Amino acid sequence: MWRVPGLLCVRVARKSKFSGSWNRPAAFMSTLLINQPQYAWLKELGLREENDGVYNGSWGGRGEVITTYCPANNEPIARVRQASMADYEETVEKAREAWSIWADVPAPKRGEVVRQIGDALREKIQVLGSLVSLEMGKILVEGVGEVQEYVDVCDYAVGLSRMIGGPILPSERPGHALIEQWNPVGLVGIITAFNFPVAVYGWNNAIAMICGNACLWKGAPTTSLISVAVTKIIAKVLEDNKLPGAICSLTCGGADIGTAMAKDERVDLLSFTGSTQVGKQVALMVQERFGRSLLELGGNNAIIAFEDADLSLVVPSALFAAVGTAGQRCTTARRLFLHESIHDEVVNRLKKAYAQIRVGNPWDSNVLYGPLHTKQAVSMFLGAVEEAKKEGGTVVYGGKVMDRPGNYVEPTIVTGLDHDASIVHTETFAPILYVFKFKNEDEVFAWNNEVKQGLSSSIFTKDMGRIFRWLGPKGSDCGIVNVNIPTSGAEIGGAFGGEKHTGGGRESGSDAWKQYMRRSTCTINYSKDLPLAQGIKFQ
């Protein structure tokens, strides 16, 4: 049993059938994990010691070979050969050619193909979820849940494929019809982040496909194996339907590939998920060519608990929102505003709840908290904790790196900072929760909105008037506005995205499909006359 500094309660959890030697020192691990017997299941996904990272109907790759690592022990899993610029050019051309075939397939038939993709993902849900846990570092239930989210989006997209379209509008001219025609944009570039390497691609891919688009995916380099495994599943479905594999192309790579996608006029829409800093650069490059971008960037999300809040909801909600995925969700709660009358009680309850968090091997079924994704993330965590102290904050729980292999840090609670402290207004992708006291509604609504990001927000109250003020024009300015639930855990039926420096894009449900299509207003004259609009006479 390894020891953890501080107050964290560590428990031995049951191992899943996929469990490996997560805590063995690196000196004992002389080979890639994929070559060790306990990780033989990786080959069920078609993975090998070295994997091609380019797919455009056939597999290849002439770029740099990178190694991906397990965040739970920092040991190498397998290698991926990334795309060269020549690979990128070839893939874009093949994707454009594939689009010309896919666009002619009726939308309900496209939905049938997406349904088959969902079914194929269902068949691999446990093993693919285990890969997400292994390469990203999130706990197994979240890894499997992420694959389930892609499956759910496929189900949603199947129904949507029979519903997309525009209205017939009343024309002011006799013998005329006025309609909206929606067509696919063409090629959709999808750049995803490490934290949701399956689900975010699924949000974009399933909806873009039923709209009639081809897709070009560049995942995060640190989760390249996941990108390869998912693409292999999709490629088999396309092959079985005698469709070009380049409809769902893949170019694993780094900033050079991402920059090429942003600047490429052949990429009709670029969906980018990542940091606000990089997202701004992407937006400028796309805008320079008058292209379309769909941005899902940072979040500095807040939970507000009023004096009438049900604390039996507040405490577990704050715990899950702040600690889930080790604080690496876009919707992670980073700020907790507590009415002054309940502040001390909630903080004490939270500290007790944090002490019960089960930390360990992400594959163990009872574990709730895994590692950060990289060593760099650990450094960022430590830097943020030190900065919070310098700015007047008090670490009342956590704040340290855990004494064990891997990228484990203690989930952390900080009190005593000003609501507008510099570190509070800086998104740190780590499990740090800043807690504040407030006096009244106007004050705390303003504090919620004063940060540059506008992704997710939540209040806890029983006051119906306050709830509707929160939802109204002077309430939360976020894209996700919740009541009596956490900031994280969005459902696929709603449009996902945020305002301000979060980017303004919307993915997944509701009418987010419109971002993957272009709209034409069409006037059809079926009469023998030629009346002009607005009653103009031109004779």
Swiss-Prot record:
Site (Transition state stabilizer): 195
Organelle transit peptide: 1-26
Modified residues (N6-acetyllysine): 94, 462, 500
Source species, domain of life: Eukaryota
Binding site for (S)-2-amino-6-oxohexanoate: 331, 489-490
Chief location of this protein within or outside the cell: cytoplasm
GO biological-process terms attached to the record: glycine betaine biosynthetic process from choline
Enzyme class at the top of the EC tree: oxidoreductase
Location(s), subcellular: Cytoplasm, Cytosol; Nucleus; Mitochondrion
Annotated active site: 296, 330
Keywords on record: Acetylation, Cytoplasm, Mitochondrion, NAD, Nucleus, Oxidoreductase, Transit peptide
Pathway(s) served: Amine and polyamine biosynthesis; betaine biosynthesis via choline pathway; betaine from betaine aldehyde: step 1/1
Transmembrane segments: none
Keyword Aminoacyl-tRNA synthetase on entry: no
Pfam families: Aldedh
Any GO MF annotation of the entry: betaine-aldehyde dehydrogenase (NAD+) activity
Keyword Isomerase appears in the UniProt entry: no
Modified-residue entries (N6-succinyllysine), positions: 94, 537
GO cellular component, one term: mitochondrion
Residues reported in the UniProt entry to bind NAD(+): 192-194, 218, 258-259, 274-279, 296-297, 427
Enzyme Commission (EC) number: 1.2.1.31, 1.2.1.3, 1.2.1.8
Known role: Multifunctional enzyme mediating important protective effects. Metabolizes betaine aldehyde to betaine, an important cellular osmolyte and methyl donor. Protects cells from oxidative stress by metabolizing a number of lipid peroxidation-derived aldehydes. Involved in lysine catabolism.
Annotated family: Belongs to the aldehyde dehydrogenase family.
Assembly and interaction partners: Homotetramer.
UniProt-recorded name of the protein: Alpha-aminoadipic semialdehyde dehydrogenase
Organism: Bos taurus
Gene designation: ALDH7A1
